[in-house]
Amino acid sequence: MEASWGSFNAERGWYVSVQQPEEAEAEELSPLLSNELHRQRSPGVSFGLSVFNLMNAIMGSGILGLAYVLANTGVFGFSFLLLTVALLASYSVHLLLSMCIQTAVTSYEDLGLFAFGLPGKLVVAGTIIIQNIGAMSSYLLIIKTELPAAIAEFLTGDYSRYWYLDGQTLLIIICVGIVFPLALLPKIGFLGYTSSLSFFFMMFFALVVIIKKWSIPCPLTLNYVEKGFQISNVTDDCKPKLFHFSKESAYALPTMAFSFLCHTSILPIYCELQSPSKKRMQNVTNTAIALSFLIYFISALFGYLTFYDKVESELLKGYSKYLSHDVVVMTVKLCILFAVLLTVPLIHFPARKAVTMMFFSNFPFSWIRHFLITLALNIIIVLLAIYVPDIRNVFGVVGASTSTCLIFIFPGLFYLKLSREDFLSWKKLGAFVLLIFGILVGNFSLALIIFDWINK
């Protein structure tokens, strides 16, 4: 039985026991991998590159939808919700790392196996596959819709018939020439430098959003005609709302959960970290989440204060409408699109690992299988990006169904199952709160989204 599960160092049924203070301190500094195994590996990825990789896993197209979320929750409501989700995301990573140290497993899927046997492993692997496919397709959807417009702004005259202004053609070329080769790399640490480039692109985007807040007047002066109606701003539209609730608010928590989900990449990054320990990886996580929170909040706040109620579900569309030929805006569009693009290969790693563990866990590594799984995933996400019309559908449904499981429900549930601590202990109470919060958020948000679709 032990051989069929892979490299377990303990039997199923082992539990996280109540720890003495000195044992807890030793756990914080203990490595996930044995010293012998770690010596056989490369020296590892530095702390900084690990932070960049994790931030790249966290940040993606979600940054474009948060200003829209802020407009539908209010400044104070958004701030509270975003901070709450960020803290809960960090705590759920803490639970995952604790369980991995104690059970001596190195993957999210194996935690599911350790807690609930083979069904647990299959559920976790299936959830990871669905979530990561949804995430990657949403990133490619951004590229398909925005890249042709970004290129067209640099051109004069009518070039509408040319291939480089066709979103589907560009999408296929990019996936074949960039995404697929990067996704084929054998180790996630190789993407550290591209992840650092993506981080600086995101910082540049946030800086431009701040600066351009004073370039677009409010009330908006543009007379924009669409479907026979004139759209304009009035003075009341230029007052920020501190609290706001509407049907569109149903997308708030799912979008935020989607924007902070990095849990499928935690253990792959941990296993390649230089001098890996629970405390060191938790510091990587806290740093990445804090920096992501800062960039998210700044870009969402100033994006909202630029357009107020007229903010688009994809923030870049607003700048295309009102600053269509601004050189800085045109440049930042290309930067943010490139940053989103560089996230896709990183998300390939946990998705491919989940497929491998679900169907080929007892087989040795094969480059042919590695190639074919990567190719299949690439084809699937391209097809989804072509046929899913609204990015909010991806954000809402994926966030409500799978992201909440991976970020809230599974860590809390697994810890409650494996731990033999007293239920009133702080860790177990925290795991219980995490579980209940995830169930409520997922079900409530999904119900509201379906209700909104029916009304439309």
Swiss-Prot record:
GO terms for MF: L-glutamate transmembrane transporter activity; L-glutamine transmembrane transporter activity
Modified residues (N-acetylmethionine): 1
Subcellular location: Cell membrane; Synapse
Membrane-crossing segments per the record: 42-62, 85-105, 111-131, 170-190, 191-211, 250-270, 288-308, 327-347, 371-391, 394-414, 431-451
UniProtKB keywords: Acetylation, Amino-acid transport, Cell membrane, Disulfide bond, Glycoprotein, Membrane, Phosphoprotein, Synapse, Transmembrane, Transmembrane helix, Transport
Positions carrying Phosphoserine: 4, 7
Membrane topology of the entry: Multi-pass membrane protein
GO biological process: amino acid transmembrane transport; glutamine transport
Catalytic reaction list: L-glutamine(out) = L-glutamine(in); L-glutamate(out) = L-glutamate(in)
Superkingdom as given in the UniProt entry: Eukaryota
Disulfide bonds: 218-238
Gene Ontology cellular-component annotations: plasma membrane; synapse
Sugar-modified residues: 233, 283
Record PANTHER family: AMINO ACID TRANSPORTER, SODIUM-COUPLED NEUTRAL AMINO ACID TRANSPORTER 6-RELATED
Protein purpose: Amino acid transporter with an apparent selectivity for L-glutamine and L-glutamate. May facilitate glutamine uptake in excitatory neurons. The transport mechanism remains to be elucidated.
Similarity section: Belongs to the amino acid/polyamine transporter 2 family.
Name of this chain's protein: Solute carrier family 38 member 6
Organism of provenance: Homo sapiens
